[in-house]
Structure formats: C-alpha cells, structure tokens
Swiss-Prot record:
It comes from Mannheimia succiniciproducens (strain KCTC 0769BP / MBEL55E). The keyword Zinc-finger does not apply. GO terms for cellular component: cytosol. Residues 9-68 form the Sm domain. NCBIfam families: Hfq, PRK00395.1. This is RNA-binding protein Hfq. Keywords: RNA-binding, Stress response. Homohexamer. Belongs to the Hfq family.
Amino acid sequence: MAKGQSLQDPYLNALRRERIPVSIYLVNGIKLQGQIESFDQFVILLKNTVNQMVYKHAISTVVPARSVSHHNNPQQQQQHSQQTESAAPAAEPQAE
C-alpha cells in the first residue's frame, strides 16, 4: 500500500462511517456537497439528493463539516483518546 493511501483510506472511511457531511472542491473550482457513501482507489461515491461518482484525480480538497478522528489502527486510536483525556483541563469548583 502506498503511503498516500495509508492516510487517505482511514480518513475517507471515518467520514463515511460517521456520515459526516463534506464539501468536495474539484480542480476546476466546482463545489460538491454530500456524504461519502463509498470509495475505492479511483472514485468517491457522494450521496446527496442523488448519487455522484467523483473521480479522485478531479478532486482538489475534501472539507468535512466537523473534525474527524482518522487513525490507521486501534492502537493509534487508543493513544489519541488517552492524549485527549490528559490534555483536557480539570473542572474548577464553583463558588456558592
């Protein structure tokens, strides 16, 4: 598997799995919006009111509506969760 695929596939899969709305900008400037239904090495199937097959070579940018966690394996996911929890500030007691 190429290095580019090792980041691309987990990222697209997380967007698909969590059904996160995305904006896909094409190299010609057109903006497409929807949810990623499926993808393979060459295309992304984008679902909105209709399904569109978008060729990856025509895509400039994929912008999710919210942030997404996209780790390649469960160990990375667990490490990320632990780092996020330890970085969260402790709640301060409120004065009565």
